[in-house]
Amino acid sequence: MKALFVANLDLSETEGIYKKVNAQAEAIGKAVGSCDIVTRKGKNARIKSCETGMVTESKDAFLDYVLKQINNTDVEFLYIRHMIPSFKLIKVLKAAKKKGIKLYYEIPTYPYFGEQIKVSKKKYRAIAKVSIDIFFWPLIYKYITKLVVIRSSSKAKHYSKMIEITNGVKTEGIISKDYSLSDTEPKKVFRMVAVGTLYPYHGYDRILKGLRSCNEKIGDVAVEFHVVGSSFTIDDLKAAADNMGLKHIVFHGVKTTEELNALYDMFDVGLGCLALHRRNADIDTTLKIIEYYCRGVPVITSGQSPLKDERFTLTVADNEEAVDIKQIYDFYTHLNQESLAQLSIIAKNQFSWINIMQHLING
């Protein structure tokens, strides 16, 4: 079976979202036979074969190319990542349904109206986008076979065509933390880490407040907060850390997967979303916590975790108060090291995109 994965993105292959959709497309290809991923290069279509890795650029506009593939080739499966709807998109969906193509439409964060408006610096643009979504939604739902969602709120409405999945990762290349290297001597430094693009709803200002409250130590143990990535939120964190006089905050900048592999052995816990209420959510859907788990690092979050095994997650209060750093430290020190050594295996089995997509498509 031939599949197309369609994502209205014009991004570098090094960016996190592109890596995610590429991993999803590769997993679909393994599940159904073959898959091409269609993204944008400017206004035109950019096509990558998941089997060969070959990249080509079409002279056709993004959705025009997709429409031609539907009408003129033997595409049998179409997976579309949510984009700002248009009449051209509806034309694509209608053509796919007419040809009997199985059509899965993904909303990567559901519901997303509140998040779009809250995290946007230009509220009027976000409101305009949401209004367009509302206008086109009945037509989108009419033509799709399944609605694939990663749910961020337990209160979200459920539709009959809806299938829930979790975020996943391409597990190949992710090296697990080596717990055989753990020092048997009493710990001298406890290290927390936050990786990736950060937004205000990650709530790491609460960690800074907590570190100030405990003077960056628990008893005789120094506490460090490591931040990997770049964003305007990280710039705000740097300024806040300086204003608070914090000395144990380490900003690493952007790192490759290989560089992260070398760093992870020193991290004790990974921080997910600590202020989910800022995006009207109560489920942590971030990719960062999936990667923490798959690397064998336990997670701190203010919401529900997708990991089925609850031993490796600490849920803190979802508010604006300082996070209790001692609570995090106590959680970590009470974890069994032998169990932690199994965390990566458990997580990679649950969060492998190959496993997620095979289950989604084949049931």
What do the predicted segments below correspond to?
Residues 4-6, 183-202, 208-211, 225-226:
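Conserved donor-binding/catalytic core segment of Leloir-type glycosyltransferases
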Residues 14-15, 19, 202, 258-263, ...:
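Nucleotide-sugar-dependent
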Residues 16, 320-323, 333-363:
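A charged, aromatic-enriched C-terminal amphipathic alpha-helix characteristic of glycosyltransferases
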Residues 235-262, 269:
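Nucleotide-activated donor-binding/catalytic signature segment of Leloir-type glycosyltransferases, i.e.
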